[in-house]
């Protein structure tokens, strides 16, 4: 069921993922390219109540949708435990758009972020 959030993540269209991921960002020295690694531990998308194939991760906010198809499952003792998704940006405008989503997602979920120095 879809919650009424400003920003959300979906693996199945119309179904919000309630598990909040750990997100790690890396950028090139000139800042024009980089990636965001999303790590979900025991996400609902891997539970027995979900049906269908995961074909990507949708990041949805008031501006629209950002889609990545780079999604993989990690198994522990034969059980799907982790879901990892990678969003790659290749321009500063893509990065700026991603950061607007990330800030909106953080506010929707009561989160903050920290930077490594």
From Swiss-Prot:
Alphabetized UniProt keyword annotations: Membrane, Photosynthesis, Photosystem II, Thylakoid
Matches recorded under Gene3D superfamilies: Photosystem II Psb28
Membrane topology: Peripheral membrane protein
Any one Gene Ontology cellular component term annotated for this protein: photosystem II oxygen evolving complex
InterPro entries the record matches: Psb28_c1_sf, PSII_Psb28_class-1
Superkingdom of the source species: Bacteria
GO BP annotation list: photosynthesis
Keyword rRNA processing: no
Localization, UniProt: Cellular thylakoid membrane
Predominant cellular place of this UniProt entry's protein: membrane
Pfam families found in the cross-reference section: Psb28 (PF03912)
Assembly mode: Part of the photosystem II complex.
Entry's family note: Belongs to the Psb28 family.
Name of the protein in its database record: Photosystem II reaction center Psb28 protein
């Amino acid at each position: 069921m879809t919650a009424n959030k400003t920003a959300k993540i979906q693996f199945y269209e119309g179904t919000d993922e309630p598990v909040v991921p750990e997100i790690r960002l890396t950028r090139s020295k000139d800042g024009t390219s980089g990636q965001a690694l999303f790590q979900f531990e025991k996400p609902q998308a891997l539970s027995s109540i979900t049906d269908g194939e995961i074909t990507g991760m949708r990041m949805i906010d008031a501006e629209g949708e950002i889609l990545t198809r780079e999604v993989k499952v990690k198994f522990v003792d034969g059980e799907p435990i982790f879901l990892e998704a990678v969003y790659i940006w290749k321009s500063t405008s893509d990065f700026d758009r991603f950061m607007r989503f990330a800030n909106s997602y953080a506010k929707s979920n009561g989160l903050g972020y920290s930077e490594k120095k």
